[in-house]
Regions:
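Glycine/tyrosine- and acidic-biased, solvent-exposed loop/turn segments at the edges of beta-strands
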Residues: 20-195
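Bacterial N-terminal signal peptides
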Residues: 9-16
Length: 195
């Protein structure tokens, strides 16, 4: 009886191991981080899919897990990222770990605004912004607009350009120094009352 059980266990293990790998070709997948349909070509092995994933206007090379999380390198992959106080939907080119931007890359919003730099666990750490939506509370007033320039974890850092409108709807631009997310040092402020 014991020999039969061992033989049965060995055969079952052999069947399970050989059944864990299956070649897939052009199978559509629905990815969990957005409602995107993609084509995958590769081998399913123990819940992971190593190989290329092609979507509408984007591609990925690496590993796709059974939970539809990507780890590897992507180009224009739809995802979310935390950008200095707000979570944004967009596309990402660079390294992904478990479906999140991680390492050096470029995150682009639907508006065309972008952040190029370092990410960690889906959060932007430091780099350069181009027309990134930004809100500044300064001197009891709220200023909303876009920022172009260097960013660190606390916000704008160094020389940058911020333009938009204040709470009263008046247009302004600030081209100058920033430190810790606040205007600092020399710069030029233009608003519609001063022009």
């Amino acid at each position: 009886m014991k020999k039969r059980f061992l033989l049965f266990s060995a055969l079952l293990s052999l069947l399970l191991l050989t059944g864990c790998t299956k070649q897939l070709t052009d199978k559509p997948l629905t990815l969990s981080f957005s409602e995107e349909t993609a084509v995958f070509t590769g081998t399913l092995s123990k819940g992971t899919y190593p190989g290329p994933v092609l979507g509408d206007g984007w591609r990925f090379e690496g590993t796709l897990t059974a939970e539809c999380l990507l780890t590897g390198e992507g180009e224009n992959v739809p995802c979310r990222a935390a950008l200095f106080g707000s979570v944004e939907d967009g596309t990402y080119t660079g390294s992904l770990v478990s479906g999140m931007p991680d390492g050096e890359g470029v995150f682009t919003l639907a508006s065309g605004a972008s952040f190029t730099g370092e990410f960690s666990g889906g959060t932007a750490v430091r780099g350069e912004a181009a027309d990134l939506p930004w809100t500044l509370l300064h001197g009891g007033s709220r200023f909303s607009g876009t920022y172009t320039g260097p960013l660190e974890s606390a916000g704008p850092e160094g020389e940058g350009l911020f333009g938009g409108e204040n709470a009263a709807g008046q247009q302004f631009t600030w081209h100058g120094g920033w430190s810790g997310g606040e205007t600092a040092g020399p710069g030029v402020l233009k608003d519609e009352h001063c022009i």
